[in-house]
């Protein structure tokens, strides 16, 4: 198989796959009920801070590489939306957890 043909096959393979959304921090979330409430609050706060730091880094990269083609810029936009969604989800989760 030649280079371009192999490249196109790879592109179609990845475009046709399930889109996994597995985050390493889900291990922390899944085990928060095994630590004290105080510790859980600290872990949630640390997770929020980590997401904010990652979002800021993504924003900085988007500014730094603002002149790249749309296909690259749109990845920064996608990541921005994901970080914002994660922060909203974390707020909701924390509110629900505080009621339990």
Which sequence ranges carry the predicted segments?
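Basic, amphipathic "hinge/linker" alpha-helix immediately C-terminal to the N-terminal HTH DNA-binding motif
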Residues: 1-8
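C-terminal regulatory/oligomerization modules of transcriptional regulators
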Residues: 12, 27-100
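A eukaryote-biased feature capturing mid-to-C-terminal, repeat/solenoid-rich segments of large proteins
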Residues: 13-24
């Amino acid at each position: 198989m030649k280079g371009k043909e192999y490249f196109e096959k790879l592109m179609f393979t990845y475009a046709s796959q399930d889109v996994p959304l597995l985050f390493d921090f889900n291990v922390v979330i899944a085990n928060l009920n095994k630590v004290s409430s105080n510790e859980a609050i600290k872990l949630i706060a640390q997770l929020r801070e980590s997401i904010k730091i990652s979002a800021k880094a993504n924003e900085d990269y988007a500014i730094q590489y603002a002149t790249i083609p749309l296909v690259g810029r749109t990845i920064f936009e996608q990541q921005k939306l994901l970080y914002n969604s994660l922060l909203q989800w974390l707020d909701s989760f924390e509110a629900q957890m505080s009621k339990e």
